[in-house]
């Protein structure tokens, strides 16, 4: 992380900056909400069906330097989960009761053929027993 965010003192008991923690999958299960930017971790977290917000304060700069395969607004579950400022992020976190879970479900259906937890069974049936 080149420029980490500053977490206001009053939120330090609720918001953890995990950008230096290397095993991100370990913390997904204990997280109520995920704040990310352009990371592919959104796919894993979406399977937990918990709110995700995309803190894209530098989106134009990122697009100019690296770009995306698809428009960013179409990559995330909904443009409404993209926030550009820290105050907007705090507002979104305050309003998770109104999170668009329908958009999250559409995102999961678009990106995953199976979400039934039976991937190992299918693997055994198709690869080992065939």
Question: Where are each of the predicted segments found?
Answer:
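Catalytic donor nucleotide-activated moiety binding site of glycosyltransferases and closely related
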Residues: 1-19
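C-terminal alpha-helical cap of glycosyltransferases
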Residues: 116-130
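Short acidic alpha-helix that forms the nucleotide-activated donor recognition element
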Residues: 22-30
């Amino acid at each position: 992380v080149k420029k980490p965010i500053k977490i206001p003192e009053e939120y330090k008991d609720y918001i953890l900056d995990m950008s230096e923690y290397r095993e991100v999958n370990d913390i997904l299960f204990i997280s109520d909400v995920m704040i990310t930017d352009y990371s592919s971790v959104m796919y894993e977290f979406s399977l937990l069906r918990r709110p995700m917000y995309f803190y894209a304060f530098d989106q134009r700069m990122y697009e100019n330097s690296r770009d995306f395969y698809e428009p960013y607004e179409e990559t995330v579950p909904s443009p409404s989960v993209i926030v550009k400022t820290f105050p907007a992020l705090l507002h979104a976190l305050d309003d998770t009761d109104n999170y668009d879970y329908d958009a999250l479900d559409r995102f999961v259906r678009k990106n995953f053929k199976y979400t039934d937890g039976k991937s190992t069974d299918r693997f055994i049936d198709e690869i080992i027993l065939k």
